[in-house]
């Protein structure tokens, strides 16, 4: 039987409770053999003016994995550097996991702009997209995709960075270990 591998890509700057809720819902719905957190080097459709060095984002993901009890980190995009095109990442993983069934998690925000993704038609042949709702209660997705409804949690990495900058609490917004790491390293404060 082919392995099922779920990929959860993102900047994770920082990883937060809403990310972990998505990971948990998908993990328990799909029951993959491997669940990869896939930190991007540079997401092609996002701005990067507050990006931490990748080793710090990886460290925060490692701390979050300890809290949720599952997951591994795939550093393919970080190792490659430059824009993190999902198509190139999937081709690389197909070389390693030849017959694996690959799943890639996206939110409705990304689902609504898939037409802008690099080589999207080829990518759709290589991976099954899992669309999690972040903007709407009901979503209609293409029949070759999987839709998973998750509880709406209005937390963003931008909000967390702003709260740190304004000396506001981020308790429960991020895992405790991640909160401690952010404080110890002095991330996101005025510099």
From Swiss-Prot:
Pathway: Cofactor biosynthesis; NAD(+) biosynthesis; deamido-NAD(+) from nicotinate D-ribonucleotide: step 1/1. It catalyses: nicotinate beta-D-ribonucleotide + ATP + H(+) = deamido-NAD(+) + diphosphate. The keyword Transferase applies. Keywords: ATP-binding, NAD, Nucleotide-binding, Nucleotidyltransferase, Pyridine nucleotide biosynthesis, Transferase. GO terms for molecular function: ATP binding; nicotinate-nucleotide adenylyltransferase activity. GO terms for biological process: NAD biosynthetic process. Its EC number is 2.7.7.18. InterPro entries: Cyt_trans-like, NadD/NMNAT, Rossmann-like_a/b/a_fold. NCBIfam families: nicotinate (nicotinamide) nucleotide adenylyltransferase, PRK00071.1-3, PRK00071.1-4. Catalyzes the reversible adenylation of nicotinate mononucleotide (NaMN) to nicotinic acid adenine dinucleotide (NaAD). Belongs to the NadD family. This is Probable nicotinate-nucleotide adenylyltransferase. It comes from Staphylococcus epidermidis (strain ATCC 35984 / DSM 28319 / BCRC 17069 / CCUG 31568 / BM 3577 / RP62A).
